[in-house]
Design a protein with these regions (language model features):
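N-terminal secretory targeting modules
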Residues: 30-49
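Catalytic His-Asp segment of secreted/periplasmic serine-dependent ester chemistry enzymes
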Residues: 1-33
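Proteins with a high burden of low-complexity, intrinsically disordered sequence enriched in S/T/G/P/A and R
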Residues: 1-4, 28-36, 67-69, 237, ...
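Short acidic/glycine-rich loops and adjacent helix/strand connectors
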Residues: 43-258
Length: 258
């Protein structure tokens, strides 16, 4: 049976089991057939190094534009989107090729990594989605059927999936979605201290956030939560004008000057 756990969650351990059982029973009743291709294991031909450097691998997958990045002693040395290798636009699959590229660029193997970071807290994201499906039922049934298979197969088990596909036994971190946005903005900037604003469609619950970056730390000050979302409003207009959501938003930006 399905089971997942998290140290800091809105749910208790018993709550996790209830959600897992609920999902399992729901999927069985819907009789959904999952036809996703089997994910290949990530490998690198480079020999293991005896480096004294600290390497962190960042991974984004299963939403849109899967990607990987490698950080060496606090600096980005490699980054790539999976679509650059697969030639599939907005490729959302586990970024095997992007990970291999980053490891080979750094001339390291998986065992040389101090840790692997995933950009999102999938358990809290599922909590928000279940709330949304319940609030909009029965109109949400089609979305439920389309969305849940990937959650049951992949997204609830990100740490396990990473360990299996990369043959990795080290530390794995799941960050909060908007903290990942704040970090990518601040740590790549030339500033030692700055206010940081991030606005997107939705993360776990947050849709916009503001924080302060100072040195190697970020303090979250305020969040706006789902269903209030400037980003989702932008996506609604993207769809209204005939473009694909999570892909065609830049075309709306291009239309703005006209």
């Amino acid at each position: 049976s399905l089971f997942f756990k998290q140290d800091k969650s809105h749910f208790s351990q018993d709550g996790h089991k209830l959600v897992s059982n609920f999902l399992e029973n729901k999927i069985k009743k819907l009789k959904i057939i999952i036809k996703d291709k089997k994910i290949k294991k990530s490998k690198t031909k480079r020999k293991k190094t005896k480096s004294k450097h600290t390497y962190i691998l960042g991974i984004s997958a299963f939403y849109h534009d899967s990607a990987a990045t490698l950080i060496k002693d606090g600096e980005i040395i490699a980054a790539a989107q999976e679509e650059r290798f697969s030639r599939q636009k907005n490729d959302r699959r586990f970024p095997v090729s992007a990970i291999n590229y980053c490891l080979e660029k750094g001339n390291i193997q998986q065992e040389d990594l101090a840790g692997i970071a995933y950009y999102d807290n999938t358990y809290l994201t599922l909590e928000r989605m279940l709330w949304s499906f319940a609030k909009t039922a029965p109109n949400s049934e089609k979305a439920w059927c389309h969305t849940m298979p990937s959650w049951v197969k992949y997204k609830l088990f990100i740490p396990k999936l990473i360990r299996e596909k990369l043959k990795y036994n080290g530390k794995i971190f799941q960050n909060f979605h908007h903290r990942s946005h704040l970090a990518s903005a601040f740590f790549a900037s030339p500033y030692k201290k700055a206010a940081i604003l991030t606005v997107d469609g939705v993360g776990e619950w947050a849709t916009a956030s503001i924080g302060i970056g100072n040195g190697n730390k970020i303090k979250m000050l305020k969040e706006m939560n789902f269903p209030d979302s400037i980003g989702l409003l932008y996506s609604a207009f993207t769809q209204f004008t005939g473009f694909k959501v999570n892909s065609g938003e830049y075309k709306m930006m291009g239309l703005a000057p006209y």
